Structure formats: structure tokens, C-alpha cells
From Swiss-Prot:
This is Bifunctional protein GlmU. UDP-N-acetyl-alpha-D-glucosamine binds at residues 9-12, 23, 75, 80-81, 142, 157, 172, 230, 336, 354, 369, 380. In the N-terminal section; belongs to the N-acetylglucosamine-1-phosphate uridyltransferase family. It comes from Pelobacter propionicus (strain DSM 2379 / NBRC 103807 / OttBd1). Acetyl-CoA binds at residues 389-390, 408, 426, 443. One of its GO terms (molecular function) is UDP-N-acetylglucosamine diphosphorylase activity. Pathway: Nucleotide-sugar biosynthesis; UDP-N-acetyl-alpha-D-glucosamine biosynthesis; N-acetyl-alpha-D-glucosamine 1-phosphate from alpha-D-glucosamine 6-phosphate (route II): step 2/2; Nucleotide-sugar biosynthesis; UDP-N-acetyl-alpha-D-glucosamine biosynthesis; UDP-N-acetyl-alpha-D-glucosamine from N-acetyl-alpha-D-glucosamine 1-phosphate: step 1/1; Bacterial outer membrane biogenesis; LPS lipid A biosynthesis. Homotrimer.
């Protein structure tokens, strides 16, 4: 929608989180909490957006540094929601449209709900519209009081409510839609004569009714959307609801989740159809997974690009890595940042890679460390191979050409280059470059001392 701005209240410390991190920056489904209502506001067409910051203001500002549609307003002392909005007013000087007022700790709010709220507000010519919900247990919420015609008369906070008012089950979400003219003409008139000695934004509702301005409420069907997060238990509850949404959207797009309740996928992860994901997997960051992949139980994937038909076996950990098509990884493999596996590569159990590129068809089937390495096509890395990439001061690279066979228990002391079509014998420590087509072997010749064991037993 056009001519819409938003104010998001994010100045509170979040004492009940018992954390050194300000509440709105706590992560939920892969994003700081504040990102979710911000995304909802943007989804409804709001621009600019003013964030009211207070505790750890610089950390919140830094999060949105460079975002051209966002301004920050400082609420140095937290004196209530009305005071917070008053602090935001200068950032919207000259704005004459409709203002959405949101809470920074409502990560479940959808952009579509705000679009509906705006449409309802404008269609009724309202000055103020409150988003409400009807709850079986409204304890702790402000109650919405209406007249016989259904118009909103006022909102009373629970601490200030009478027993009769506490029996009302329609509650205030803390989310509002207001015309800028009414809002900024009256925000300075709020008082703090209440149980908490704060400037309540809700008092604008009663003020609108007294002045004959239209004040309405739109009840939301899904009360989860307006759930505020105040402590770690509520954070986990909100995260669970977000995961259900994310997982449902993925399943409807053709992804199979064996147990959605035990699958942890961040918002923004892209997964292709016919991919199968087993329980207890965590997929985070800007990860992209292709079509027809299999992700087995206990896998952790962070910020990776995975091509079609890959299989990630149980217990593997993948970080900042790229897998092309038809790659097999694991079980119990660890791909560290900078790993690139080309088509048909196999990484087996207890293999660790870091800043390593493996060419098409190459394999390291078990018990291997490959760090700072570039490996060609159709290379076999034997069991127990180690690239010795660190000399105690600097890291060095290992370069292995195409069609090389590396036997078991080989150490490649970098910097070193192994030419194409060569063979490294089992147990060899490679300290010099190996020419193409060569055999490299550095073992001590085997000596068999016949009868030695029998003689030793007799001595004991």
C-alpha cells in the first residue's frame, strides 16, 4: 500500500530474558527477533520504518546500518509506549499518511495481517484502528472496551482494570494503525496518571473517542500472530510456531520431511522438490539445496550450496561449503568453510575438509584430513591420509593432479605438488614434489627377524 510508514518499538531491555543481549536481537529461526515485524511492515508496504531504540541502541543501529528505508529514534529513558512513539515523531516530520505501530518482540506477525488491517482502517475512514484478539485466558493483556455499536471506547491495562473489565476477553495486541495527523497532533497530550506512571499509547484510543474520531478494532483469528516474547520459554514457543510455518511451506512445495516437529530449518533456506530430510536435522543460514537430495538424521548444514541428487549421511556437519551434483558425504563427515566438491565426489566417514577443492569423481572414503588442498579429477585418497598444511606459523597448500592414487596412511607435508597419474605408496611421508606418472615411496625397508618373538618370551 502507498503512503504508509511504520514505527517499531524496540527500546526495552527485556529483563526477563536474563541476557546480556537486548531482547529484540535474540535470534529466532535464523534471524534477530526484530527482523520479523520489520519484514511484516515492509510486506505491507511501509516505508519509511522508524525503530525506537533504547537499551543497546548502537547494537540495534548496527544491525540495520545501510538500510535506506530505516531510521532509528532514541528513547533514552523508557517511560511507556506513548513516550516511545513521541520519540519517533521527529523522524516522521512532514509525513501525512497512515502509520503502523508495532512491537519489536512479536516475531509471528504476518505482513498479510497488516495489509488487511490497513485495508480495514482505510475503508472505514478511521483515525485509529487497533488489532485485537479474543482469548480464553486474557491474563496480563490490556482489555478492549467497546460501546453497543462495537466502536472502541478505550483500552485499559490489566493493572488499572476493574474486576468487571478484567472479565472482557478481547485483548489489545499492541499493534495499531493510526492516521499521522491524529497521532502527531495528540501524542504530546498523553499523561502518566496510572498504576505504572507511564505514558500509555492506549490512551489515544479514549482520546479519539472523546474527540468524535472514528476508533475501531479488527480482531485477528490466529492469536499466535500477536504473541509477545518476554522470556526464553516464550522465545522457544515462538520458534516452534515459526518452524511449523517454514516446514509446512516447504512440504507444500514438494519437500519431504519425515518428522517436521524434529526438523529445524531457518527462514530463507531454499530446498528443491523431491528432497527427503530425516529427523533431527538443522539447516541454517543462506543455504540452498537442490532437487532429489537425501539428508539423513543428525545432519547440520550452515550456509551451503548443495546441488541435485546429493546424499548427506547421518551425523555430518557442513559449513560454508559447495557441493555440485551427485555428491555423497558421510556418515560423520565434517566439511569446513571453503570446501568445494565437484560432481560425483565421495567424502566418507570421519573425513574432514577445509578450504579444499575436489575434482569430479574423486573420493576420500574414510579417516582423512584434507586442508588447504586442490585435488584433481578421479583421485583416490586412501584411508588415514593427512595434508600437513600448518608449519606452526603459516598454512600451506597441497596440489594433487588428476588420476592420482594416494595409498593409506600417507602424510603430504605442504607446500607440495603431486603430478597427474602418479601413485603414493601406503605409509609414505611426502616432503617433495612428485612428478607426473611417478611412484613416490618413503618407507623404511621391512626387516623380518625370525624367531625374535619366541626368544623374547623365553627371557620373560
Amino acid at each position: 500500500m502507498e503512503n504508509v510508514a511504520a514505527i517499531i518499538l524496540a527500546a526495552g531491555k527485556g529483563t526477563r530474558m536474563k541476557s546480556g543481549l537486548v531482547k529484540v536481537l535474540h535470534p529466532i529461526a535464523g534471524r534477530p527477533m526484530i527482523d520479523w515485524p520489520l519484514e511484516a511492515a515492509r510486506g505491507a508496504g511501509a516505508a519509511p520504518v522508524v525503530l525506537v531504540v533504547g537499551h543497546q541502541a548502537e547494537a540495534v543501529r548496527e544491525r540495520f546500518q545501510g538500510a535506506g528505508d530505516i531510521a532509528c529514534a532514541l528513547q533514552a529513558e523508557q517511560l511507556g509506549t506513548g513516550h516511545a512513539v513521541a520519540c519517533a515523531a521527529p523522524a516522521l516530520a512532514g509525513f501525512s499518511g497512515t502509520v503502523l505501530i508495532l512491537c519489536g518482540d512479536t516475531p509471528l506477525l504476518r505482513g498479510g495481517t497488516l495489509t488487511d488491517l490497513l485495508a480495514f482502517h482505510r475503508s472505514q475512514g478511521a483515525a485509529v484502528t487497533v488489532l485485537t484478539a479474543r482469548m480464553e485466558n486474557p491474563h496480563g493483556y490490556g482489555r478492549v472496551l467497546r460501546d453497543e455499536a462495537g466502536r472502541v471506547l478505550r483500552i485499559v491495562e490489566q493493572k488499572d482494570a476493574s474486576p468487571q473489565e478484567c472479565s472482557v476477553r478481547e485483548i489489545n495486541s499492541g499493534i495499531y494503525c493510526m492516521e499521522a495527523g491524529f497521532l502527531f497532533d495528540n501524542i504530546g497530550s498523553l499523561g502518566n496518571d496510572n498504576a505504572q506512571n507511564e505514558f500509555y499509547l492506549t490512551d489515544l484510543v479514549a482520546m479519539a473517542a472523546q474527540k468524535g474520531a472514528t476508533c475501531l478494532a479488527m480482531a485477528i483469528e490466529d492469536s499466535d500472530e500477536i504473541m509477545g516474547v518476554n522470556d526464553r520459554a516464550q522465545l522457544a514457543q515462538a520458534a516452534r510456531i515459526l518452524r511449523r510455518r517454514i516446514n509446512r511451506d516447504l512440504m507444500l512445495s514438494g519437500v519431504s520431511l519425515v518428522d517436521p516437529e524434529q526438523t529445524y530449518i531457518d527462514q530463507g533456506v531454499v530446498i528443491g522438490p523431491d528432497t527427503l530430510i530425516h529427523p533431527n536435522c538443522s539447516i541454517s543460514g543462506p543455504t540452498q539445496i537442490g532437487n532429489g537430495c537425501q539428508i539423513e538424521s543428525g545432519v547440520s548444514i550452515s550456509s551451503c550450496r548443495i546441488g541435485d541428487r546429493c546424499r548427506i549421511k547421518a551425523g555430518s556437519v557442513l559449513e560454508d561449503s559447495e557441493l555440485r551434483a551427485d555428491v555423497a558425504v558421510g556418515p560423520m563427515a565434517h566439511l569446513r568453510p571453503g570446501t568445494v566438491l565437484n560432481d560425483h565426489v565421495k567424502i566418507g566417514n570421519f573425513v574432514e575438509t577445509k578450504k579444499t577443492v575436489m575434482g569430479e569423481g574423486s573420493k576420500a572414503s574414510h579417516l582423512t584430513y584434507l586442508g588447504d588442498a586442490e585435488i584433481g579429477r578421479d583421485v583416490n585418497i586412501g584411508c588415514g591420509t593427512i595434508t600437513c598444511n600448518y608449519d606452526g606459523v603459516k598454512k600451506h597448500r597441497t596440489l594433487i593432479g588428476d588420476n592420482v592414487f594416494v595409498g593409506s596412511d600417507v602424510q603430504l607435508v605442504a607446500p607440495v605438488r603431486v603430478g597427474a597419474d602418479s601413485l603414493i605408496a601406503a605409509g609414505t611421508t611426502v616432503t617433495r614434489d612428485v612428478p607426473a606418472g611417478s611412484l613416490a615411496i618413503s618407507r623404511t625397508p621391512q626387516v623380518n627377524r625370525e624367531g625374535w618373538r619366541i626368544r623374547m618370551k623365553k627371557k620373560t
